[in-house]
Structures are given as C-alpha cells and as structure tokens.
Amino acid sequence: MISTLASLVKSFFGKVPKEDATPPAGDAAFAQAIALHQQGALDRAETLYAKALATEPCHFGALSMLGVLCYQTNRAQRAVELLARAVAIDPVQPGTHSNLALALNAVGRGRDAVESCDRAIAIDPACVEAYSNRGNSLWGLGRRDEALESYARALAFDPDHAQTHWNEGFLRLQLGQFDAGWPKQEWRWHLPHLAASRRPFTQPLWLGKEDVAGRTLLVHAEQGLGDTIQFCRYAKLVAALGARVVLEVQPPLKGLLANLEGVNQLVARGEPLPPFDLHTPLMSLPLALGTKLDAIPSESAYVRCDPDAILRWREKLGPSTLPRIGLVWQGTADNKSVPLAQMLGLVSPVAQFFSFQQGVSVADQALLDSHPEIRQDAAGLHNFADAPLLALMDLVISVDTSVAHLAGAMGKATWVPLPYNPDWRWLLEREDCPWYPGMRLFRQPAPEDWGCVITQVRKEITARFG
C-alpha cells in the first residue's frame, strides 16, 4: 500500500512537472525544492520548502509538497499537519485531499482517510489517485470488498495505473487469490522506485513459459531480506525442472544460504556474475511456477546453519533445565511492532528468554538492561551471525521481521504477533501459516490491540512450558 513520488507529485500538480515547469506560486525556492525533490535530494528539498514557508507561511505549494516529503520520510503525523493546512488554504484541489488521505491512513485514521478521498472524488470524479488511495484506506479498515471496488474504479479511468495494480495484487494475495495476485505483482516494474532497480540484463526474462532444462538461470533477490529468506525455497523447484541455478542474494545472506538446496552457485550482489542463459527476479518465481494457496512449497527446514557454529553456541550457553525462548519486538513499521514494555509481559520463570532484536533504541536498551533475566547474547551480531544461536531456541516469538522468516525457514517453532491488517503473506483469520509449517500466528482482534495478543501468547507459553 505504497504510493510513489511520481504519483504524489502528480496528484498535486495534475501531472508530473518537468524540471523547467513554473510552480503555481512562481516562488524560486519552491521551484528549486520541487526539482530537488524529484531528484531524490530530500534534505535539500526540505530546506528549500521551509525557506519558502518562512517567507510565506501560507504558501499552498510548499505546505503540500513538504507534507508529501514528510510522508515519504516516515513522518506521517507531520505530513497530516502540513497537508491539513494546505487543504484549509485551498479546499478545491483533489490531489491535496488524496495526499492527506495517505498520511491519515499512515497514522491509523483510516475512516478520516476515506472521507478525504471522498472529498477529492467529489471535486474530481475521475481522480485516479483518490480512488486508489481510497482502496488502500478501506483495505486498512478491513473493508476489502469495498477496497477492490475502489481499485476497479481507479483502473477504469487509468488501466495502466501501476500503483493500483500492485496494491490490488497484494490484497488479492492476502485473500488467498493467488491466480489473480501473482500476475499483478509484475506491475512493480512500472513503479519509479522499483523500475530504477530493474536489472538491465540482455538475457531473456523467464516467467515459466520456456523450458529451462539444461540452461543456466540467474535468480536475483530483490526487496527485503525477509522476502529473500521466504522465496529462496523456490531454487529447489527450479532445479527440479533441470535448470542450473545461480542465486544472487543480498550480501548479509550469503553465508546463511551457502548450503541452500537446488543452488549450483551462490553469489552476493555486487560480485561478478557467471555466464547465464535466462534470469528471473526472485519475487517472480511464484508466478513462474504457478504457486497456488493449497500447494505452497512448504518444506519445514530449508535453511540450515553450520553444525559446528551451533555446537560452539551450545557450549557457550552451557546446560539449561529451562526451555529457551527468543524475542523480537520491533519491526520496520510501527504497526508491526509490539512496545517492549508490553512484550516484557511474556517473561516468566517457566523459560529462559533471549533478545534477538537488532537496532535496539536507546529507550528500549535501558528498559532491556533493567531486566537481567533476558539474555542479550545476540547483541552486536550482524549479517545473521546469530542464526546458530537461534537454532538453539525451543521457541521464537517475533513480530513480522526477517528473524520470523529465518526461524520459520529453519523449521523452528515460531509464534508471530500480527497487526489487525497484516502483510499479505500472513493471509487472513487462520492461525497457521502455509509458508512455514512450524509457525503460529497471533492476530490483533482490533487495530493497535496488542494487549489481547500478549495475553494469549503468555497463556500459550504457560500451557506449553509451564
């Protein structure tokens, strides 16, 4: 449910402005800010937007586009404040209402976001961005059928609106409609922030139609580390078709995936590539191989750590009469994260607890240090060097992070607390996870309600180990 800069700028101007276009206010600082914004120089653009506002506090364009910039840089509440001021100055600009909806949705005000989109549509009944953003907001509220209707309206006005196709694809996947969802994921290459990272290979793209037997297929990772851990399982399936598989992964994963079955050669991104005949982005393999909900390749343990490394950790930890439980509470998005103070509610004498949290905030570190019963052996370990320690856990409790994927891929018993509207891969309602047989999902019954989730998980810990 992401909007690109081009879409955001387009919804403000009515079209993506050229660098030599004169902005509505004709202000020099604003004009420079827009050019820098589109070039990705966000710090410099922000400085110039602020300069324009210092000169003219009610500068509609600067308020609007600084709001967009704040949204892009994960300052959604500030974006709401700026865009709301812009709307108050000029309430008849549909793009500004639509952008405000994005920011409102990001701070959990989904109903207000829908209303903002409705105002944009009332001004311009053909506002594609507003229909698309309305779909995102409705999806976040759990009104998925209405979201699909809004996406359909957006695509009726613009059949090539890549952002809408991509978002609808995620929703279809969350609904388990894989036949419709996987093809729409290919629209990602029409999004500016992803198109720029598309690999310019001269070898043909393979999406499952050509025979790969006897040919070398380069499978190259994309997007996040968790995505790579989840989808690297497909290497084995491609190898079963007779292909020689070269897998390119992010550098932190090279050591971890060194023994992945089905891979003839593993390389880290940035290393020289061997000769190959065809290539496939890793996230396109489910489409290429026709993955269906009832036939997800779900081998229980396809990522295996070095046995010697596990032995070294076992000796370091020493014997324990208690089960070991690993904890991760902070994800990349606030709505995926459980506050540490609440996560500590799981700690009890029935088990020995270990923190596997990376990038601990100063406040969380102080709180963590006040609980010596939680071991911090994994602190300071990077590039998945803590995987052998993770292998010694009897249970891993992790929010939606790469650690959850790693534990699942290692076949560990893994419990995942999920937000009310989770990422597509966790589907809906079910407690099990078809991607990872050893995983159990604990879902929020209502937005932001981690209390019920923690209470349930604590009861299950007691039932399992108490």
Question: Predicted regions span which residues?
Answer:
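Alpha-helical solenoid repeat scaffolds of the TPR/TPR-like class and their adjacent stem/linker regions
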Residues: 1-395, 400-466
